[in-house]
Swiss-Prot record:
Domain of life: Bacteria
Designated name of the protein: Indole-3-glycerol phosphate synthase
InterPro entries per UniProt: Aldolase_TIM, Indole-3-glycerol_P_synth, Indole-3-glycerol_P_synth_dom, Indole-3-GlycerolPSynthase_CS, RibuloseP-bd_barrel
Top-tier EC class: lyase
PROSITE patterns the record matches: IGPS
SUPFAM superfamilies linked: Ribulose-phoshate binding barrel (SSF51366)
Length: 267
């Protein structure tokens, strides 16, 4: 069984437990009470190369990365460093995240928030909105085409934005067929967990104008941001480098690089 398949099995089991605990009707009522979502697409379009900083305790490829006892404090550091948006892992078994982390971060910061998880059900989309998310990750490799389209439509019906993640040409084609407006190109191979930054450079030219492109994985510092920007990135997502170093300074350095004229070469 692949790493992705194992993760999805756990996600479905945990989802079933939450559905028993909190009925969908209750979630929908909570959605009606939360403030309207932030317009993340406008934030990305009005920025130079945007930085999405991630609250990430662990990963299947690296194991434990950081304890992160106070995700709100980490998010405040990210916001102070200039992050355009913050990604919050909510998958618990492999990434050590939770919806409580999303709640804590939402209370602390004003920038758009991405719920980063393995979304397979509309229930999770309503969860994301109920807990304050403005964006929701959809991983093409985890979904068949009807489910991908349906979830993207549900996300947008609640005023949020879908970040549709791809890893190869076929997945990019599916994302575009699903009318994705925000596409994340992940340089990490889901089968081997290895990072190949050339993946972004290969796929980005196939993304049509008007679709915002996010480079995911392999962002260690400003040189990586500039390389991704030269290949056409509108934004980068940074996780490991931010949580294992000085979070505020790491983000600030990336933001400064993204604002540099050199970052506009490929855009």
């Amino acid at each position: 069984m692949s790493v992705l398949a194992e993760i999805l099995d756990g996600v479905r089991a945990d989802l079933a437990a939450r559905e028993q605990q909190t009925p969908l009707a209750d979630l929908k009522q909570r959605v009606e009470r939360v403030p309207d979502p932030r317009d993340a697409l406008t934030v990305f379009r009005n920025s130079p190369v945007s930085v999405i900083a991630e609250v990430k305790r662990s990963s299947p490829s690296k194991g434990k990365l950081a304890a992160i006892a106070d995700p709100a404090a980490l998010a405040l550091d990210y916001e102070a460093g200039g992050a355009a948006a913050i990604s919050v892992l909510t998958e618990g078994r492999r990434f050590g995240g939770s919806l409580a982390d999303l709640d804590a971060v939402r209370r602390a910061v004003d920038v758009p928030l991405l719920r980063k998880d393995f979304i397979v059900s509309p229930y999770q989309v309503f969860e994301a909105r109920a807990h304050g998310a403005d964006l929701v990750l959809l991983i093409v490799a985890a979904l068949d085409q009807p489910r991908l389209v349906g979830l993207r439509e549900r996300i947008e019906s609640l005023g949020m934005t879908a970040l549709v993640e791809v890893h190869d040409e076929a997945e990019l084609g599916r994302a575009l067929d699903a009318d994705a407006r925000l596409i994340g190109i992940n340089a990490r191979d889901l089968r081997t967990l290895e990072v190949d930054r050339a993946t972004f450079a290969r796929l980005a030219p196939m993304v049509p104008p008007g679709v915002i492109t996010v480079a995911e994985s392999g962002v260690r510092g400003p040189h990586d941001l500039l390389a991704y920007a030269a290949a056409g990135a509108d934004a980068v997502l940074v996780g490991e480098a931010a949580v294992t170093g000085d979070p505020r300074q790491t983000v600030a350095d990336l933001v400064a690089a993204g604002a540099h004229p050199a970052a506009r070469v490929g855009r």
